[in-house]
Amino acid sequence: SICQVINLLNQPYVEGSRVRMMPDIHAGAGCTIGTTMTIKDKICPNLVGVDIGCGMETIRIKESHIEPQKLDKVIRNGIPSGFEIRQSSGRHRFYKDIDLSELHCANKVDVERGYSSVGTLGGGNHFIEANKDDEGNIYIVVHSGSRHLGLEIANFYQDAAYKSLTTYSKDEIDAIIAELKSSGREKEIQSILKTIKMKNSPVPKQLAYVAGELFEQYLHDMRIAQRFADLNRKAMMDVIVKGMGFHIEERFTTIHNYIDVDNMILRKGSVSAQDGEVLLIPINMRDGSLICVGKGNEDWNFSAPHGAGRLMSRSAACLLYTSPSPRDAHES
């Protein structure tokens, strides 16, 4: 984590940014999870990551009792998980609320797969859970993001970022040609142009950044992915609420992989904590989640941690530790 933080702080596009690391910081792919920073006119797509808009949808229901077996059945029968998506004939109706053809990179992503992914959980650390607070109120939480669509968008713009830094622009090529002509070296133009197809990138590929028009296009497409992730979670919650006959008394959303465009703040594994804002911080299956209220601390980019953090990957933990049964873990 320390090496990744140092590497990030040494990048040219971070100069002048207010960078803050959350208490749950841990190493990620390319950068640390638990990062928040202010941005201006450049950004590395990898800092947001591949699960654009990932977060939690939380509802508090009127009911004081639920049937766990029925809830489990509703979820398993109505919400695809893992690599599964919906059939085109069985898409959730919320897919009509977003137009993926508006993406600048629409021809580089699987739009139809995206529509069929609305209302699907995915894998990894994504989850659906029921919680009860100290006053007996019951909450349902859905944690998921933009699914494969977010991955495709992130990979496209990260590749485009690196290409933009290693490929000479038309203006640069024209300047080289003009210099050769002014030096009387017109005959060398074609041979020299063949040797300068690539230039050295000022940053590593995984930390390459978008700027100018590419920056604006990324922000545009990222916002669409964030909207997609929000609809995805709400679609799953819709399945649960209708299947269980729940009555919603309160709901709120907590996002942790995105750029707050209104305030130009990037949050990677951190969440918005504006003054008075209600947010959710999940800990683990045994200890549940924390319902918190933001303090609006500007020095910390109006942000809070998105979880408890971890010392190793899930796969490494499975190899080193024997998990107790869910009942034993919850009762410990």
What residues fall within each predicted segment?
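N- or domain-start disorder-to-order transition segments that initiate the globular core
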Residues: 1-15, 118-120
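Hydrophobic alpha-helical bundle architecture
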Residues: 282-304, 311-319
